[in-house]
């Protein structure tokens, strides 16, 4: 998303707190190209945010100072205010690194975190296990809090945050916030342990335009409730494949709704669930069957990073010619695809998508793929879902009304 959208998002979400902590992605200068565009460093400059470097100190001492000094000198416009040392082996190790950084890089060390073998947060193929699947999530957070309290100079870290210039929440008001229809519509969002990855701005973009968001569980509910459109985000259907397969009544109701023309937008995990089956090793799990495609879970990522698409076929949500940018990270690949019963709407310009060439599988009123998009960087996405939902609602209402009209026209009144 662009500069204005980024600032608007930050302003909106930072309004409730005195200090906002922004977690950097990858290294400070790592972006989409050699110039570091869209990097953490560029974001820090855009938001006028002070930077705290977290330095991996495993098996290094004075070299840590060279890394910190290099970060300071590579872009002097960055406001780097301090350093946190990570994976330190002991007090002597920490003292040597601290002295080197303070002498050669001229920055204070605001925390020293020791190397830990029993980390409170467990991981798997796509990163940390998310709270809905973590039996001891609160315990892990409590332990992480104690580690932070023991190892970080929290008063000085907060002082760095408080030194940043204040933001006006209305600096970039959302120009689309009042684009609402007169009649409310309902958009279902499948949200449970299997489907849990949603950008908050995506849901806000829908509710800002008048949609009522209804959360649905594909694991616990017996059937899909009455909604005007459905949004199925990413998640981990592979870890819940058995439970998803066992809930046959929900799977069948979802397929039936798709066949009746329910507008459905699905990303990654949602795409997999709309398919016919998911193969994990020697096990095969039936999915909803709304799309004529099957998937296989692999041991290595099949797509990871930014993705750019060009829409070249008519579909339920994007005009032909639209450029769609997003992110993909999936271990699943398409195993079989019956192209005679469906079609792909997008050409892959960058990234992998379904096969390195095509993305966005369509059937009925479904658009599904591995791409995660962000509403603030996808102009028209929310409006398109709202529009399709209103259209579907009107079509259903006309079918309900038409029998009584036919009866009256036949002489009933």
What residue spans do the PLM features occupy?
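Acyltransferase
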Residues: 131-183, 191-195, 358-396, 400, ...
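ATP-dependent carboxylate-amine ligase catalytic core
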Residues: 1-47, 55-82, 91-95
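Cysteine-nucleophile active-site neighborhood
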Residues: 213, 237-317
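Internal gly/pro-rich beta-alpha loop/helix module
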Residues: 61-179
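Glycine-biased, low-complexity coil/linker segments
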Residues: 407-408
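Phosphate-binding active sites in nucleotide-utilizing proteins
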Residues: 183-259
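A short helix->loop->beta-strand "cap" motif at the edges of active sites that frequently abuts
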Residues: 49, 107, 259-263
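C-terminal and late-domain segments of enzyme folds
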Residues: 195-205, 212, 297, 304-398, ...
